[in-house]
């Protein structure tokens, strides 16, 4: 499944501790109610306009990066733009923005049930790049410029979301028909004249066999 998520699709809601607001990009499972229900992962973006304390999420881990503005001070340590950082959700964090226009991007995911990675990427004008997508959920968040895949195009602030099924969920006929290995190769393009900067967030549920081993 491939879908384009625009800022108009995001759900704006207060932080868990009430000290700010965030735009929820995607919550899994979608039937969960944040923050009262347990969830597997949540992708969101928030404008940080003043000092605050981060909401705490015991049992979860978090990826965080800045995609607009000068960065953040997290417990007196600088988080620069496009430099994702991983930390435990229960860690007390005092946050201070280094400019008035800071906007972050975050992924919160259930420890022991989900693995996650966040990387900052870029494409020069008219450049294309091939990605091999592992089974799981992939989010390509466009922070600057334009990002295109097949017939879909994301502008700044929009997200391309791709779910890749695991091979064991496909029968033999489907694997042969769709050429599973080839299908998982994705080409991202920058159709614009300016550099594109984006984030790739990859999340995968940990299998029962991995948990028990």
Where do the PLM segments sit?
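Jelly-roll (double-stranded beta-helix
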Residues: 1-213
């Amino acid at each position: 499944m491939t879908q384009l998520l625009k800022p108009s699709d995001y759900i704006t809601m207060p932080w868990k501790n009430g000290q700010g607001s965030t735009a929820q990009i995607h919550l899994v499972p979608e039937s969960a109610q944040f923050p009262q229900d347990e969830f597997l992962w949540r992708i969101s973006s928030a404008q940080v306009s003043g000092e605050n304390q981060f909401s705490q999420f015991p049992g979860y881990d978090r990826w965080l990066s800045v995609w607009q503005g000068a960065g953040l001070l997290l417990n007196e340590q600088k988080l620069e733009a496009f430099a994702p950082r991983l930390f435990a959700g229960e860690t007390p964090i005092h946050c201070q923005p280094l400019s008035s226009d800071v906007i972050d991007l975050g992924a919160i995911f259930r420890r022991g049930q989900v693995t996650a990675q966040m990387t900052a990427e870029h494409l020069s004008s008219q450049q294309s790049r091939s990605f091999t997508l592992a089974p799981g959920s992939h989010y390509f968040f466009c922070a600057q410029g334009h990002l295109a895949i097949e017939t879909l195009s994301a502008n700044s602030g929009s997200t391309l979301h791709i779910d890749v099924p695991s091979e064991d969920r496909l029968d033999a006929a489907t694997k042969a028909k769709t050429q599973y290995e080839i299908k998982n190769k994705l080409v991202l393009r920058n159709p614009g004249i300016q550099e594109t900067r984006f984030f790739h967030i990859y999340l995968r549920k940990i299998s029962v066999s991995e948990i028990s081993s």
